[in-house]
Design a protein with these regions (language model features):
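Canonical leucine-rich repeat
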Residues: 59-62, 81, 102, 123, ...
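Conserved hydrophobic beta-strand positions in leucine-rich repeat
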Residues: 47-49, 71-73, 90-94, 113-115, ...
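Consensus "Asn ladder" position of solenoid repeat domains
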Residues: 54, 76, 97, 118, ...
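Short loop/turn motifs at secondary-structure boundaries
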Residues: 372-458
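Append "Rare intracellular matches occur via the same short Y/T/C beta-strand/loop motifs
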Residues: 46-53, 175, 326-328, 346-359, ...
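Solvent-exposed segments in extracellular or luminal domains encompassing
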Residues: 337-354, 422-423
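N-terminal capping/linker segments that flank leucine-rich repeat
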Residues: 7-70, 87, 106-108, 127, ...
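Solvent-exposed, low-complexity, repeat-rich "mucin-like" stalks and linkers
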Residues: 301-330, 398
Length: 458
């Protein structure tokens, strides 16, 4: 048969793979039987060819499809693919094979390339300026240069070994998936059209999505982020930022009610989350048990536990007790000398208890007043419920006070205090009194009466 065709001048294309040739027979490009040859004139004008899932090992002969524009050869057993002669190719789908190399430098008209689920170690798309959709996920790529692909709309390159990726020239990118790589940073400032972005399982320490106002889906889980702010992303419906090192999470985008899936679990130092409405319904968000929702990041320090101690008045030294939350310091903010449990304080001073996490800090303070007299009468107090000077009382170190009476400037009795009482909180009949001077009459056990005045400051 071959000799006869040769005699009458019909050119043949060598197709050694029987599964490939059988597919061409089924499509009517050959009449059989299987003889490893197909008439070239039957295939050199074919525009669209689909040979998916046929167990093909060898696509020798594809070079004769010189007019081919769309080629689909997914889910075969290909280890190599030579398309250098198919210069009209615009769409190539060759995923789920065993390709280790793919040369598309001779296919300048490509607009779609899907080569996912192979073993490709290097992919050069710099000669494909019209590329709109690139899917190369689940390969062995260590780098990917898409700078020469300004029209790229879809880029899926997850599950590779890519350490850096520059998408600054891809300003029409709307879907970008780069999870499970080795990325430590990403710059999305030139991708304003981004709607679907996933970068989970990388090593990213910082992520700025303030310019990506069209974002709907964001997955940045399993990275090393310390803060994330989606206050400019009012279209977000799904966010997964779990398993990071978040200290700051700002979800106040004016549209929290539009969120259908939220997960910020496994951020152990995240004390609070900024939201639209702290008292709103967040019952579907993960973790369900989280409740520290606030309206401003400035409120976050309130969630760091720190021990508090009452002010101390003594005529002897004072020994610092053990703390659960925080450490003793000479100055505010964890500065100055650090004191330890059991240290003996012999002079009057204010001591600060400072506690910090990787994200936030909080502190309290108390005063130690060491007096030589039997009693001490404070000159002022500040009843504002901050834990400091909230009560006025006479400090009696030797049980010398019998009773204390407090009056306003008109002589009205406001409060009577026994020696062991907590003190006066600045109220009368449950109502807080104004900033002013108030008078005391202290009666000692000896019968001596001491009179004077002190200030209430609010």
């Amino acid at each position: 048969m071959f000799a006869l065709l040769s005699c009458i001048g019909i050119s043949q294309t060598y197709v050694p793979d029987d599964n490939f040739e059988q597919r061409l027979i089924d499509l009517g490009y050959d009449i059989g039987p299987l003889d490893d040859n197909v008439p070239t004139t039957n295939i050199n004008g074919v525009i669209d060819l689909d040979v998916d899932g046929l167990g093909i090992l060898d696509l020798t002969g594809i070079e004769a499809f010189s007019a081919l524009e769309t080629f689909t050869c997914q889910s075969n057993n290909l280890t190599s693919l030579d398309l250098t002669q198919n210069t009209s190719l615009t769409q190539l789908f060759c995923g789920n094979n065993q390709l280790s190399n793919l040369d598309i430098t001779q296919n300048p008209n490509l607009i779609i390339l899907w080569c996912d689920f192979n073993q490709i170690t290097s992919l050069d798309v710099t000669q494909n300026p019209s590329l709109i959709s690139l899917r190369c996920e689940n390969n062995l790529l260590t780098n990917l240069d898409v700078i020469q692909n300004p029209s790229l709309n879809v880029l899926v390159c997850e599950n590779n070994q890519i350490a850096s990726l520059d998408v600054s020239q891809n300003n029409t990118l709307s879907r970008f998936q780069c999870g499970n790589n080795l990325l430590s940073n990403l710059n999305l400032s030139n991708n304003p059209s981004l709607t679907f972005f996933t970068c989970e399982n990388n090593q990213i320490t910082s992520l700025d999505v303030s310019i990506n106002t069209q974002l709907i889906n964001l997955n940045c889980a399993f990275n090393e982020l310390t803060e994330l702010d989606i206050s400019n992303n009012s279209n977000v419906t799904q966010l997964d930022c779990s398993n990071n090192n978040l200290c700051r999470l700002n979800l106040r985008n004016g549209n929290n009610g539009n969120i259908t899936a939220m997960d910020f679990r496994a951020n152990p130092d995240l004390n609070c989350v900024v939201v639209d409405n702290p008292s709103g319904n967040h019952s579907t968000w993960e973790p369900v048990s989280f409740s520290n929702y606030i309206a401003s990041q400035n409120d976050c320090s309130n969630f760091v536990n720190v021990d508090t101690l009452d002010n101390v008045v003594t005529n002897i030294s004072y020994t610092l007790p053990a703390l659960i939350n925080g450490n003793y310091f000479e100055q505010s903010g964890g500065n100055g000398i650090q004191y330890n449990t059991g240290d003996t304080i012999t002079n009057s001073q204010t001591i600060y208890i400072y506690n910090e996490t990787a994200c936030d800090s909080n502190e309290s303070s108390f005063s130690i007043l060491i007096i030589e007299d039997d009693y001490y009468i404070p000159k002022y107090f500040t009843p504002n419920n901050d834990g400091r000077h909230d009560f006025w009382q006479v400090f009696d170190s030797n049980n010398s006070v019998k009773m204390t009476h407090i009056f306003d400037k008109y002589g009205k009795l406001l409060k009577s205090l026994t020696p062991n009482s907590q003190g006066w909180n600045g109220t009368f009949n449950g109502n807080p009194l104004n900033t002013d001077d108030y008078w005391y009459v202290v009666t000692l056990n000896s019968g001596e009466v001491i009179r004077g005045h002190f200030a209430l400051k609010r």
